């Protein structure tokens, strides 16, 4: 019941969010319409700034917007002024509010003494020859730009308003976020709403009728799987089990409870290997086992385990506290030459006693002994340091 109430609250919150979305859509619609009207007003004002604003052009643009039911186009100035005022008022009433200001600015009469001329008289160099033909003049008279702009269809953004959703169809509608997750959950199950006594009785029934409640039939298998498992796997398959060498250098099974992946034969049921049918084993040896024991560093006293073990590396490290102290570098022998430990006089006597009898008077030329195992030492030249 608590979950149903939470689900209902989530749905109500979803409807409230939808209402807020509709209000935002209306605000966007209004802002788009306002921006379109401002852009049209700016375009019309820019066009008027580009064209010369003379009394003749302003009067001609307004005379074209006059109704064609007039009998004379070239009337007196006073009559034309009155007609222009009426036309301007009617045009202001019919145009949208974005263009009313521009039409009012054009509808104001300007004082001029000469009669207004048509646009054809401004373009043609000889207007006097065509004044007598009223028919072609009316056909050639261009329409005003304001009338053309008003007839153009403006792009408008429309949003389809969704109707109120009844509560019955809430479950069938796609929700957003947590509402979609809550809607996908099946909370109307009859089993979950049962009391605890129902489940206790069900458990007692299953315990008393255990044989009837548990299915003892083998699982059905596809015919293709039966054929493949009976023919190909048993004949050509060889079970391979994986082992790993531990620190005591004994092979340990990697997965002792896992049977063979193909024939599903456990490791315990596999018979001993023979020469005719040997058992195949895959053994993996870690690199830490293959390292020699002298490369193992002595552990710190807190982290070193001093308990007895059969592992070779740890057994070699048990005597880390009784290692002999390291000798200093100054006392260590620099080479393995035996002549270095004998004095110079003893060397001279040894060489003179073993000299040859054929040349007793000849002086003995002693060659410096060449050390066989020593590293030749080259004297470094002494360079005096300069005082700064």
Curated annotation (Swiss-Prot):
Q: What induces it?
A: Up-regulated by IGFBP2.
Query: For this UniProt entry, which segments traverse the membrane?
Result: none
Q: Where, per the database record, does this protein carry Phosphothreonine?
A: 141
- Note down the stretches annotated as region Interaction with IGFBP2: 239-282
Task: Spell out which residues are annotated as carrying Phosphoserine.
Answer: 303
Q: How does this protein assemble?
A: Interacts with IGFBP2.
What superkingdom heads the lineage?
Eukaryota
Write out the tissue specificity statement of the associated record. Ubiquitous. Isoform 1 is expressed in brain but underexpressed in glioma tissues, at protein level. Isoform 2 is not detected in normal organs, but is expressed in gliomas with increasing levels with glioma progression. On the contrary, at protein level, isoform 2 is not detected in gliomas, suggesting that this isoform is unstable in glioma cells.
Composition skew (Polar residues), residue ranges: 138-152, 344-357
Cysteine-cysteine disulfides: none
In residue numbers, the region (Disordered) covers 32-79, 94-159, 344-388
Q: Could you state what the record's PTM comment says about this protein?
A: Isoform 2 is degraded by the ubiquitin-proteasome pathway.
Q: Where is the signal peptide?
A: none
Record function comment: Inhibits glioma cells invasion and down-regulates adhesion- and motility-associated genes such as NFKB2 and ICAM1. Exhibits opposing effects to IGFBP2 on cell invasion.
Q: Where is the composition biased (Low complexity)?
A: 37-65
Please provide the record's keywords in A-Z order. Answer: Phosphoprotein
Q: What name appears for this protein in its UniProt entry?
A: Migration and invasion-inhibitory protein
Task: Tell me the GO BP annotations in alphabetical order.
Answer: negative regulation of cell migration; negative regulation of G2/M transition of mitotic cell cycle
